[in-house]
UniProtKB/Swiss-Prot annotation:
Location within or outside the cell: Cell inner membrane
Family statement drawn from the similarity comment of this UniProt entry: Belongs to the CobS family.
Task of the protein: Joins adenosylcobinamide-GDP and alpha-ribazole to generate adenosylcobalamin (Ado-cobalamin). Also synthesizes adenosylcobalamin 5'-phosphate from adenosylcobinamide-GDP and alpha-ribazole 5'-phosphate.
Domain of life assignment: Bacteria
GO molecular function, one term: cobalamin 5'-phosphate synthase activity
Catalytically driven reaction(s): alpha-ribazole + adenosylcob(III)inamide-GDP = adenosylcob(III)alamin + GMP + H(+); alpha-ribazole 5'-phosphate + adenosylcob(III)inamide-GDP = adenosylcob(III)alamin 5'-phosphate + GMP + H(+)
Source organism phylogeny: Bacteria, Pseudomonadati, Chlorobiota, Chlorobiia, Chlorobiales
Membrane topology classification: Multi-pass membrane protein
Organism of this sequence: Chlorobaculum parvum (strain DSM 263 / NCIMB 8327) (Chlorobium vibrioforme subsp. thiosulfatophilum)
Gene name as annotated: cobS
Pfam families, per database record: CobS (PF02654)
Protein name, per record: Adenosylcobinamide-GDP ribazoletransferase
GO cellular component terms given for this protein: plasma membrane
Length: 254
């Protein structure tokens, strides 16, 4: 079972991890929320370092860059490929072909710039408020969302791809375990506060369903790039609604 954790850490981070990979890569999906907690914890350390210097803007930059470096920019690369393929391809075949191109096009560049700016703004607000649990929660929920997509949507490429080994055996057990783990970690990180936890969960679900709907419409399934893009967009959605919560825009339901 721990071999799944090894595979999840090696897949989602640059951390050097001893041990053997899982025989079935899909078993690593059980551990995605836990690895999200590890990544989120490190991102929080970067944010705290910046705040320790009395510089919220630096805290947001350190958290942003720390997250990208820790994950090799893997998910950001997936988002760029998705943007190029989905908005630059006229049909399913063209979209899949463009997504496989290692070069980043105009749509991908715009997506990356937009993501970095949006993340920086949200992280700045969260760091200023000392809402470190919300920062970590965004990372946990984004990795949980990847499991839900992998478990419920087919792989789009008939010839397979880099994420095939993770998706082909994924099913309800992975979805249920990851969902429960992700929600429990969310509530722990937010000190069992029901309203803010529910708001963050709602934001993640909206982003998840949007990515799933768009991917089904454009290519009829998912790829590794879609899973990466899902992580980025869910993370942003969670941090955004968290920032709105801190600004009192959900006070009517508190």
């Amino acid at each position: 079972m721990l071999s799944g954790l090894v595979t999840a850490l090696r897949t989602l981070t640059v951390l050097p991890v001893p041990g053997r990979d899982a025989e079935r890569f899909s078993s690593s999906l059980y551990w995605f929320p836990v690895v999200g907690l590890v990544i989120g914890g490190i991102v929080v350390l970067f944010a705290r370092a910046g705040m320790g210097a009395g510089w919220p803007e630096l805290a947001a930059v350190l958290a942003l860059l720390g997250g990208f470096i820790l994950t090799r920019g893997l998910h950001a690369d997936g988002l760029a490929d998705l943007a190029d393929g989905f908005f630059g391809g006229r049909n399913r075949e063209a979209a899949l072909r463009i997504m496989k191109d290692p070069n980043v096009g105009s749509f991908g560049s715009l997506a990356l710039i937009g993501v970095m700016l949006f993340k920086w703004i949200c992280l700045l607000e969260l760091a200023r408020a000392g809402a470190y649990g919300m920062i970590a929660a965004g990372v946990v929920l984004s990795r949980t969302a990847q499991v839900l997509l992998a478990a419920r949507m087919p792989y789009a490429r008939s010839e397979g791809g880099t994420a095939t080994a993770f998706v082909e055996d994924a099913g309800w057990p992975h979805l249920l375990v990851a969902s429960v783990s992700g929600v429990v970690l969310l509530f722990v990180l937010l000190d069992w506060q029901v309203v803010p936890s529910s708001i963050l969960l709602f934001g993640s679900v909206v982003a998840l369903f949007f990515v799933g709907w768009l991917s089904h419409r454009k290519i009829g399934g998912i790829t590794g790039d879609v899973l990466g893009a899902c992580s980025e967009l869910v993370e942003i959605a969670v941090w955004f609604v968290a920032a709105l919560w801190l600004k009192g825009l959900f006070s009517a339901i508190a």
